[in-house]
């Protein structure tokens, strides 16, 4: 244990200790009367889910709450500590060797600082959410974090997460096979996808269509481990399957790039910025660039068009796309104008 947070002593738990059961921690995660406060919880939750099939519930994510409360996009913990707790954060141990045991006193202090300020930040942000009536907005986002589907990637669907510029069905078929192999390989060996090959390497492979290990050797982006052995064999088999299949994927109907979409997407970006500024919410929490392109191309089954996002932005985005409203610059600000 170490320095106290507002609610009592802060404690370090070392999951690398041989034979240590994390079940008491997971029991706390399941305890419904105790709110678990995290900052940027998603990666932590993915670990807990795959390790034990458990989520800390109820959960409060200070990064999401801060984005709803006007602190900007993907606001860092250090920023919140400075602005809300008004404390400095010693980052000198950030890049030390965390696998070495025992941890140094400086490392322990650094690790404990990740929680010692969370209570003050939580209390401040919940008070802000109560004032603005936006607690339900945060609850919507947390519900996504606590949904097992958020962390399950099925190999057959992995290609849908790869961003591509080409809508060629044959190219997409090769992307699909390469993504399927990568996902299966990563899951079987419990390694990150990027350790197999990154998205940019996947796109390069789908474009160059290597058929031999000699072809793989010419890749600019493939890691050395991917040029031989099981990964190389998997890549070559995936490319061959993608070239030979008759089951060609169809580009999504809301795929960006159809004629006339670019201008509308730009108008939607202006509307998003204006609406986000007016609501003091980070724009990226409302809609991504891909969401705007999809709306401009006719996509309607999108998070940006439902729930609290529809109130803030989505409803007017659809009206703008339908020509029912226009945008006007007035007194240095963007205004929505009804079209009669």
Per-range role (PLM):
Residues 70, 109-110, 123-124:
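Catalytic palm subdomain of template-directed nucleic-acid polymerases
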Residues 1-79:
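Conserved RNase H-like, two-metal-ion catalytic cores of nucleic-acid enzymes
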Residues 105, 121-340:
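Accessory DNA-binding and partner-docking regions appended to nucleic-acid-acting proteins
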């Amino acid at each position: 244990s170490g320095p106290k947070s507002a609610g009592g002593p802060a404690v370090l738990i070392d999951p690398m200790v041989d034979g240590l059961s994390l079940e008491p921690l997971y029991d706390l995660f399941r305890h419904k009367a105790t709110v678990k406060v995290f900052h940027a919880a998603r990666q932590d939750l993915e670990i807990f889910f795959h390790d034990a099939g458990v989520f800390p519930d109820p959960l409060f994510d200070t990064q999401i709450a801060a984005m709803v409360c006007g602190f900007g996009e993907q606001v860092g913990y250090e920023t919140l500590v400075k602005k809300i707790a008004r404390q400095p954060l010693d980052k000198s141990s950030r890049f030390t060797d965390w696998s070495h045991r025992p941890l140094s006193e400086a490392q322990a202090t650094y690790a404990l600082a990740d929680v010692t300020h969370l209570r003050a930040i939580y209390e401040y942000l919940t008070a802000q959410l109560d004032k603005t009536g936006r607690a339900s907005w945060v609850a919507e986002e947390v519900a996504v974090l606590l949904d097992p589907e958020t962390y399950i990637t099925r190999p057959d669907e992995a290609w849908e997460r790869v961003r591509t510029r080409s809508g060629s069905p044959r190219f997409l078929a090769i992307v699909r096979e390469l993504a399927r192999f990568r996902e299966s390989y990563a899951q079987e060996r419990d390694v990150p996808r990027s350790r197999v090959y990154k998205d940019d390497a996947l796109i390069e492979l789908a474009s160059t269509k290597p058929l031999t290990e000699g072809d793989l050797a010419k890749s600019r982006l493939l890691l050395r481990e991917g040029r031989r052995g099981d990964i190389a064999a998997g890549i070559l088999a995936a490319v061959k399957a993608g070239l030979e299949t008759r089951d060609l994927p169809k580009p999504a109907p809301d795929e960006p790039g159809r004629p006339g979409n670019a201008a509308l997407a730009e108008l939607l970006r202006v509307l998003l910025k204006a609406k986000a500024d007016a609501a003091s919410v980070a724009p990226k929490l409302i809609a991504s660039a891909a969401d705007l392109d999809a709306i401009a191309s006719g996509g309607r089954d999108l998070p940006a068009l439902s729930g609290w996002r529809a109130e803030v932005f989505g409803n007017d985005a659809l009206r703008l796309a339908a020509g029912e409203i226009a945008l006007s610059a007035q007194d240095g600000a963007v205004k929505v104008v009804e079209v009669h």
